[in-house]
Every structure is written in structure tokens, then in C-alpha cells.
A protein has these predicted regions:
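C-terminal catalytic/acceptor-binding lobe
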Residues: 2, 34, 196-197, 202-219, ...
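Acidic donor-binding segment of Leloir-type glycosyltransferases
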Residues: 38-84
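Glycine-rich, basic loop-to-helix element that forms the pyrophosphate-binding segment
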Residues: 86-103
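The conserved acidic donor/metal-binding loop of glycosyltransferases
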Residues: 112-116
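A recurrent flexible, glycine/aromatic-enriched loop bordering the glycosyltransferase active site
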Residues: 169-190, 196-216
């Protein structure tokens, strides 16, 4: 019989460190266990913390024996883990803002609860953020069921940064907006195979936004407003990650990192009530203010 799982306390967890991983979850015990297993296999970034915030309808996902074992494995390997519940639900943006408030780390990885990271991914992302000095870097998630679906038209949107990423103001209708198409299906995997980077090497490329696995400089994310726009949104929304990244891009720049070590589990979404795009609301307000 599995013994009760210690959730940890904010006082013990919220301390300065190099990196915290922030995971929102709801009704996904199996997927959360896989996501945590990917983190437990990371090396090269000692002592990173993990926050899991659960909004499940019933028992929290981290209470499932498989997920609980991965929590214990992370702690056994020297990683502080804070387990919380955030109810009632007020939408994705509020959940992200809450998670961000739990951290005092230099960098925060916003990781979805249905993403497995291959070994070496965290080291590559942390290195890239440090060397590039921008607001965020990310790994777009691969959909491996699409490996035989090659889409050359999407590949043309891949463009590398020649040096440090520069701030960009990206809006719908601009050519830059279509960069996101490189992240659909297995497009980035196909681009990576075509480029054939040497083992251990990585490249920074231009993005409009990245879903699922984004590493922010925490101070730069907060400087750009974080997810504080949540209070201006209805509960039923999506696209909060896009809204935050557009703001960070405009102030501090950002980049995708190739190769990506992030793999999408391709499970059905638990965000079924998403009538409003958060980025549309935020952008319309910024336009009105001008």
C-alpha cells in the first residue's frame, strides 16, 4: 500500500535557485506521471524545483501511485517538489499566474502536463537561455504520430537567429505570425532531420510563440506582465501562453531551440471550454490604449 504523499510547503519550497518547473494539471494522472518521469531523468541542472498545481474534478492527479512515485523519485534525486491544489478554477491564465507566484528561481519552465522530455533537454534549454540572454527559449513539442506526414510548405517558416534574439513586435496578419506553423504535427522534427545538427549542438530560431515547453527568465517574464492579465479574461479561454510570449518578445526577445527534446503525448485535451483567445483580448486592449 502506498503511503501518504507529503505535498510540501511554500515556505520550504520558494527559495532562490537556478530553475523551477511549473506544471498545471487537471484530470490527467497517467500523463502527469509520464511528464514527471521525463523530469526525473534529467541531469546537468542539479537541484531544480518542481511545482505541480492540480485542478482535477476528483482526487488530485499526483495522488495516483505512478505520479506519486515520480514525485518521490524527483525528491530522492535532490529536487524539491511542491504539490498544490488551485480551486475553484478561474481559467488557464490565473492558474499560470498562481504557479509563477510559487517560484523565486532565476528561470521558470512552463511545462504542460502531457509532455515528455528526453534526457538532456533541460541542460540544453538552460544553456540556451543563458547564452542568448533573451526573455524566453522553448522546445516545440513533437507529435510522433505525424512522422510520416511531411509538410514542406510549413518548413519554409524556419529561420535562424544569426546572433542574440532581438525584441520583436509580432501581431496577427504579419509574416512573422505564421512562424507558429513550424510547430504543428512533426514539422520541427522533419526540419531537424534535414539540417542534421551535430550531436550536442543547438540552434536558435525565430518564433511567434511556442506551446507546451517554454523556459522564461523569470524577471523578464514578470517585467512583461507575467500572466496578470488573467483578471481581464473570462474563465473559459485558451491562448494565455501566446499572450504572455508576445509581451516578452516585444520587450526582451525570444527563440525556439533546435533540436527539441519535447514530445507531445497526444492525449485528448482537458481544456474543452475555451471560447475566448486570451491573446486576442490582451492585444485588443493594448491597441485601444494606443
Amino acid at each position: 500500500v502506498t503511503r501518504p504523499l507529503d505535498p510540501g510547503t511554500l515556505e520550504q519550497f520558494r527559495r532562490p535557485r537556478r530553475l523551477d518547473v511549473l506544471i498545471p494539471t487537471r484530470n490527467r494522472p497517467a500523463e502527469l506521471a509520464v511528464t514527471l518521469s521525463g523530469l526525473a531523468g534529467q541531469e546537468g541542472v542539479p537541484g531544480f524545483g518542481v511545482v505541480v498545481s492540480d485542478q482535477s474534478d476528483g482526487e488530485p492527479a499526483y495522488a495516483h501511485p505512478a505520479a506519486a512515485t515520480m514525485v518521490r523519485a524527483l525528491r530522492h534525486r535532490g529536487h524539491p517538489v511542491l504539490l498544490t491544489r488551485r480551486l475553484p478554477r478561474r481559467g488557464l491564465a490565473e492558474h499560470r499566474a498562481y504557479l509563477l507566484s510559487r517560484s523565486a528561481a532565476d528561470a521558470v519552465l512552463c511545462l504542460d502536463d502531457d509532455v515528455w522530455l528526453e534526457p538532456g533537454t533541460l541542460t540544453r534549454l538552460v544553456t540556451a537561455l543563458h547564452e542568448l540572454g533573451c526573455g524566453f527559449v522553448g522546445n516545440a513539442v513533437h507529435g510522433l504520430s505525424y512522422t510520416d506526414d511531411v509538410r514542406p510548405d510549413a518548413h519554409r517558416h524556419y529561420e535562424e537567429w544569426p546572433g542574440r534574439p532581438e525584441p520583436e513586435r509580432i501581431r496577427p496578419g504579419t509574416p512573422e505570425w505564421h512562424r507558429a506553423s513550424i510547430h504543428s504535427a512533426a514539422n520541427l522534427l522533419h526540419v531537424t532531420e534535414k539540417l542534421g545538427p551535430p550531436a550536442g549542438a543547438w540552434r536558435a530560431y525565430k518564433v511567434s510563440w511556442i506551446g507546451g515547453c517554454v523556459l522564461y527568465d523569470r524577471a523578464k517574464l514578470i517585467d512583461a506582465g507575467g500572466f496578470d492579465f488573467w483578471a481581464r479574461l473570462p474563465e473559459r479561454h485558451q491562448g494565455e501562453d501566446v499572450a504572455a510570449q508576445l509581451a516578452v518578445l516585444e520587450r526582451h526577445g525570444g527563440a525556439g531551440v533546435l533540436p527539441s527534446g519535447a514530445y507531445h503525448l497526444e492525449s485528448p485535451t482537458t481544456v474543452t471550454e475555451r471560447d475566448v483567445e486570451a491573446w486576442e483580448v490582451v492585444l485588443s486592449e493594448s491597441t485601444a490604449e494606443v
